[in-house]
């Protein structure tokens, strides 16, 4: 199954999603649709791993659910005991087209990728929704043998996974009760930098001239103007915990098209590099320079472009999602 560029880069005014996920999770006063590979309303003692897969900008959770299932099939016995979870972050156009109930959470076309508040029914962050999923997994009556949780995304979903690894609170709560948590960030268009430095042509880093792009360091590209979800968190206090979390970056070796329609070509994104592969490798080098003991890992998947299904089914993808050797 090919998950390609349009996952992240549909034009403004995009059409509604074809399918609404069939399960529901209350989040505050709202409701989040999602796909589940097993009914979690009954105890699931056989589940030892939960894999949360985040869709791209098209919000096509059905496509990503199928891709997650294909990856699990490819992982074979390594995926035994896995619960697959694919939440769906809807837009207003989806709610109107499908005549969904007024309590269905929905965001603007892009705001959910940065953890911004929902448009309705309440200003609930997409990160609040991920917190709610992780809180559900903490229920030891429902998941008595759960040992690990993976939060993975490709393209626009990779942006969510990355930024949730920076700001999210749910993962630390899981770790506090003894569960392992990993974030898998595949082929996003941009990353969060912790200071005004950006890559230079000689492979180093230097303070980026703000006059060339006044918003280059604003959230979601930098730490200025964090979303309400962050609360009183000081940007300087976020970096060290992030560097210590288990994060895996996956980049397609062929995801190098500077003119690919879905590529974020804003000046803030362009300040990070010419294409996704370059941006990802530069960001990893940036983190390594700042944190020699960085807990993060990275892998390039040769011959794969902007294709989420192929990324997840690759050897590095199966290792990241299911610990397949």
Residue ranges and their predicted role:
Residues 153, 157:
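Gly/Ala-rich beta-loop-alpha elbow adjacent to hydrolase catalytic centers
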Residues 177-289:
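The feature captures the conserved acid-bearing segment of alpha/beta-hydrolase catalytic domains
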